[in-house]
Every structure is written in C-alpha cells, then in structure tokens.
Amino acid sequence: MNAVAPSAISCSIRPGDEAASRRRSRWIAAAQLGLISSTFSTIVSQLFAARIGRDAAVDWMTVAAIPARDWAISAEPSWSAILAGIAFHQWADFSWALVFFGVLGRWTADLRPLTILLLALPWAVFSSSMEWFMLVPLFPFWQPLFTLQQPYWIGLLVHSSSAVMYPLFARLRWTGGAAPARNVRFTNAWITGALALIALLGATALFGGHGYEPPWMGHDRDADQTYIRHMTAHHAQGIALARIAAERAQDPHLRKLAMLMVASQTGANRIFETWWLSWFDTEMPDCSSDERAAMPGFLTQAEMRQVKAAPADQFDTLFVETMSKHHAGAVRMADQMWHSGGDLRLRVMAHAIRHEQQGEIALMHGASGIAAVTTAFRNMLGDNVN
C-alpha cells in the first residue's frame, strides 16, 4: 500500500474551507450565546421587576403589543400576551447577539472574555437606544406605545442583563473542548456567578411574594407613607375611570389604551400594598375625603358621574379630557417623590409613573412617529404637563 504524505493531507484542507468552517462555528456559537443571553435576561427581568416597582406581566404585555398591536392588550394580562411578549423579547435579544458575534464577528469573535464584557455593556446602551428611539416607535414597527409607556432605563437594564452573558462566547466558539484554559476558568466563574444571581433574585422574589420585601430604607417615614397612600387612592380612581372607557369608548384603540391603564395601575397598586405591609407591618389606612380633595387631579364625584352619563358621541372627548387631568395630577405627585429623599425603590417607581402617565396622555391625543419619540424623551427628563 502507498502511504499518503502528511504534506498531502495538510494541502487537502484548503484555506477557503478552513475560513468557511470558522464562520459556521462562529455563527453557531453566536446562536447558542443568543439563546443563553436572552433566557438569562428573561429570568432576571421576571424576578427583579417587582423589586423596582414593575409589574412584569404588564411589561411583557406591552412588549407583545409591539408586533401584535392592540390584540395583546387587556385589563388583565393574558397568558398568551405574556408569552408573546417573552418570545418577542427573546427574539430581539437573540438577534442582537447574532449581530454582535455573527455580523461583527470579524472584530469580536476572537476577543478574550473580559474584553467582550467591556464591549458588551456599551453595546447594551447602543442596542437599547436603537430599539427605544427608532426600531420600535419608527421603522419597522411604528409602535409608539412602548417608548411612551416605558422609560428608556428599563430597556437598558434588560439589555444589560443580556449583555453580561456575552463573555461566554469566548468558550462557545471553540469546538471539541479546545477552548484555552484561561477562557474556561473565566467562563466557569461567570456561569457560577450568573446562577448565584438567579438564586438570589429567586429567593428575594419568593420572599417578596409572601410579603417579605427588603426593608424600607427611606429618610422620612411619614412622607413615604403619605405618598403610597395617596398614589394608591389616586390610582384606584384612575382604574375606575379607565374601566368605564374600556366598556364605552367608541374608538377601539382608546378602549385598548384604557385597558392598559387598568392593567398598569392595578399592578402598581398591588406593589404598593405589598411594600406597605412588608415595610410597615400594618394595614394601609384609607385616605380621608379632605386628603382626596387636596390631591392634584383627583376628580369629584360630580366629574365621575359626568363621564359615566356622557352621551356616546361625546364620551371619547370627555374621557380624554378628564383622564388627562387625572394623569397630570399623578405626574405631579410622582415628580415630587422622584425629587424627594424617599426610599430609592419608591423614587424609581415614581420616575416610571411620571413617564408612563405623561405617555398615556400623549397616546390619548394620538402621538406617533417622531413626535412620540420627542415627547417620550422629554417625559423621561421631567414633568411636561403641569
């Protein structure tokens, strides 16, 4: 038998074939990383949401409304909308990973884990900005609700939680266990840290679900208690008003927006009640009639009756006018809390309420396109309705 020379074997592997194989491996690793990072982000977002005053179910429903429009919105988030929101979020995170390691792989694929991490965090800023400022409210989705409903920092947190898993690519791109030992050590430690974080957030969420949140950490107990009581009462009236519109509004889109108001404010009140019981270990007292009358934007009984009794052809206009007044009052209250020395969780939640309710005023008045983006950016920075 004739022996084949080693040089002949090496020559049979052409440079073009080797490059193609590397590209395939890179794209496969990018897809694997996308699945890991998007799943990690979903888990962290779900477990952490309530700790900063977010109702995860409402947020997933809002995300589902990006591609599914009004179908996804209901007064109580449905499982189909929640799952659609999670699926759309994971698809988006998966796609950003493919861009980072696939499309841009010529520059990113061979980096060390720590270098990837240092680049991934600015990438999270870029990708979340692209979604919030352009891809969702403008081309290709033309859906202003997401940007007007959720302040930018929520998307930044979500994208950051995905980006922190990018260093695992430095191990995934090597086939057959050929990854350098330093990459293996780094990624082993990184995976351990990620699992520990999930366990910590899971335990915190479990205790929170049973009424044991991390303790109150504000500076003025009376001020924080007053804010929670007042905003809970204010939201309760907003829910009652929105429920009327969810049944009576002539414009189908306005009906759906009213349902979203019910869902978001109901979720906020659940969080307020959980925090109150956990922090202060007592039932939340009702607001007195004098307190209600003094709240900005709180409606009188006569105003509520006027909306209920409005003729069908006048209802939408009256509801938008009345709810805009009510929302403006909540914006003022939330803005005061944001600038106070209250518990950080209350302040973060207040910032989101200020943004959300100004955004809903804009949506009721038909904001869309670049005007919606401009309005959302201004709303994120301050009170623009009082």
Name every feature range the model reports, one short phrase each:
Residues 183-386:
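All-alpha RGS (Regulator of G-protein Signaling) helical domain and cognate RGS-like helical scaffolds
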Residues 106-129:
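Internal alpha-helical transmembrane segments of multi-pass membrane proteins
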Residues 3, 95-98, 156-173, 238:
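Hydrophobic cores of alpha-helical transmembrane segments in multi-pass inner/ER membrane proteins
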Residues 165-192:
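Cytosolic-side transmembrane helix boundary signature
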